[in-house]
Amino acid sequence: EEQVLSWEDGNDANNDGISGRASIVIDPTSGVNRLGRFGYKAGTFSVKHQTASAFNTDIGVMTSMLPNPDCGSAQQDCGSAEVELSDQDLDKLVKYLSLLGVGARRDYNTQNGARLFSDAGCASCHRPSMTTSAFHPLAELRNQTIHPYTDLLLHDMGPGLADSLAEGSASGAEWRTAALWGLGHA
């Protein structure tokens, strides 16, 4: 988190034409403010929060993390607020998702593209690497240098890309820098 917060430049103080700010979200379990890192607008802070949120909002499955249905104002008959996915099953799924790997770069052209990417200024937001926390719950993921090509910050992309939907601390025009790792494997 310290690394991401060090990249914050909400008012373009360095005059590079790019401003970015961290998304701060509330941990639904503890009520503590956390750094948002997942989702289009960095509205969730962990793989577990993202997974529980997807279960809740996408398919209506409640967890202990998000035990209440997200029905919106238009729904008349909303589901009941009972946990449908156990903590043990959620934790197993989170571990699986957390340990999924990203494929290695494949050829010289891809690596040559990285230089052009940097020269064009793309790496100002799509930062090539960062280091994972020494305190990650999974030992396999502690102190790892990863190459996600993101700064995990929110950037105001203007009215042409705005969706008019706020999420967490993000406005309708703000989006988390999309991670670009693994794109060539699609």
What are these regions (language model features)?
Residues 1-186:
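Periplasmic c-type cytochrome electron-transfer domains
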